Amino acid sequence: MFIDAGFDVRGMLGQWEHNYPDQWSKHNAQESGYGGEAIENMTRWDWGQDLFEWFEYYLKGIGEKPELHAQIQRNDGQWRIEDTWPPLDRTSTEVPLDTCVQTGTRVQGVSGSGGSVSGVVIECDALSSEVDIHISGLTTLHLEVQASMDGGQIFVEIQDAETNLRIGHATMDIRYYQGGSDPTTVLPGQSLTMLMEFQAIDALLPAGHGIRLVLTETGEDYLAPACGVLCPITVNGGVLSVPHIDRDGSNVLITPQGEDAANNQ
């Protein structure tokens, strides 16, 4: 998007949460599924140098023009260089949810507190039984639902169905089911499609491992809707679209890791 608008863009995209890339003593607080698997290759001592060279060139006209690319970290810690991200050569596999196994029918919570009264779990077969799937980009979930009133929301966590490892999440208020920032009035009993998009994912799904979708009213640090038990949402299927890429290792970026940081577990 920024490149198309004519901007020069360079990115270093890691799993540091709100810590600096070289704050290795804080990285070990990251849990499994939130960067914990990447700790041995997490720290980037060179990020400050990158910023310095960027500002020297663009603010002062000093030095060579920085390379315009994305340094992206996969969930297992591997770094690589991409021309842009999400990669332009990604392909997408669509998984109709009626080919998966669904447990539960309604997503419903408690007003304000966010406690779950009921949820839905959907388990899908492996995208490939022979090769690992490298998910890279913005996974989407077009969820067919029925509203009970003008309110309610769904939080979705995507997991490796074999290991239970968290891969990513998405959340949507049903009033924004068409996407965008403007709400739409939803009527009781109305059937509609929630156009959900997961936060950016770059993760490896091993061959033979299926995908699990866990649907609740809220999760992470998102606020629960005020209507709570009064606004359950019935889930009637949909389509999961998973973007993925093939890489041969030629663009892997080897980063220096200090002994203390790499063993800070």
Model-derived features: where do they sit?
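Short, well-ordered beta-strand segments
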Residues: 2, 54-57
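Glycine/threonine-rich phosphate-binding loop and adjacent beta-strand/alpha-helix elements that clamp
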Residues: 47, 56-265
